[in-house]
């Protein structure tokens, strides 16, 4: 990281048990900017990089996501081909609204439209009905939908999120 031009004392590198990974935290006084991203990524490898500055953190996440995007596209495409969901895949530009596109994604995955996805702002949210406490049933029902949404959101650079994580805390 020093070879990347970061200032000594401007970053920390330590193992974080709650992450089960090494986390590199880059402070504002490290002197990092977007020009350093390639070097930082190479130096960090697969470790977690966090910037204390929110804008820098978001910019770095965008940078890292773009690097991973081609590999992710291939992985998702292969998954869709394996499950028979590649042919006839809905195209975003064929729909007037994000809501209509989300409903088409559900239908393509064999899920009733408007039953598990909803739109909020410029993003699609996974919000399935809470009618199944059986994990195996849940996975069987929604794994194809999540594969379809993962491909669509990566391809079209759409925001995607989950609703209902508060149940994990119970």
Identify the residue ranges that each predicted region occupies.
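Long, low-hydrophobicity, acidic/polar, solvent-exposed interaction domains
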Residues: 1-170
């Amino acid at each position: 990281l020093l070879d990347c031009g970061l200032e000594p004392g401007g970053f920390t590198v330590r193992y974080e048990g709650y992450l089960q990974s090494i986390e590199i935290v880059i402070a504002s006084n490290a002197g990092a900017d977007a020009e350093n991203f390639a070097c930082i990524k190479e130096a960090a490898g697969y470790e977690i990089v966090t910037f204390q500055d929110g804008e820098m953190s978001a910019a770095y996440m965008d940078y890292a996501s773009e690097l991973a995007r081609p590999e992710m596209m291939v992985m998702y495409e292969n998954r869709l081909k394996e499950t028979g969901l590649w042919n006839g895949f809905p195209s975003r530009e064929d729909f007037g609204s994000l809501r209509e596109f989300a409903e088409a994604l559900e239908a393509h995955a064999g899920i009733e439209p408007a039953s598990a996805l909803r739109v909020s702002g410029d993003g699609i949210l996974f919000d399935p009905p809470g009618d199944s406490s059986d994990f195996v049933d849940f996975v069987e029902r929604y794994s194809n939908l999540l594969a379809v949404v993962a491909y669509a959101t990566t391809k079209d650079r759409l925001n995607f999120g989950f609703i209902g994580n508060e149940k994990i805390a119970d």
